[in-house]
Amino acid sequence: TYGEDPYLTSQMGLAVVKGLQGDGTGKYDKTHACAKHYAVHSGPEWNRHSFDSKNISQRDLWETYLPAFKALVKEGKVKEVMCAYNREPCCSNKQLLIRILREDWGYDDIVVSDCGAIGDFYYPNHHETHPTAAAASADAVVSGTDLECGGSYSSLNEAVQKGLISEEKINESVFRLLR
């Protein structure tokens, strides 16, 4: 982040997005900027793969953490959003990814996981919120995480075979990635 001031963070983030993506008037994208880490935490601390930000109040979430992301999505038209690590994994958090990001803010571009974040759902001594890679991967895609930085999504075929996710749901993510 650029600091704890939501307005300053928003303005600096918008300048970076505009500088990277351009003004959007060209035939092709200049490059994709990525707003990260949505939302609340993905710091460099040693415990980021087991950290739990449950002490963040709804007021703090809405007044401190979300304003910069909202500005980057609605004003900056950022092309990618990276979901954060957290004990309740942000990469499978339907409130953050579907209700707020996609429905309330109208975001229809790419959501990417931070590296290893989907693995944290099931790796021993990490978050351990899901029993297997297939369950974790299916939940992440259903929740709106289109692209994974890691190897867990290789289990999506198994997830389809087990009925954890449909091919149509996977195709939604694939289409966003290929646009």
What are these regions (language model features)?
Residues 1-179:
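Glycoside hydrolase catalytic-domain context in secreted enzymes
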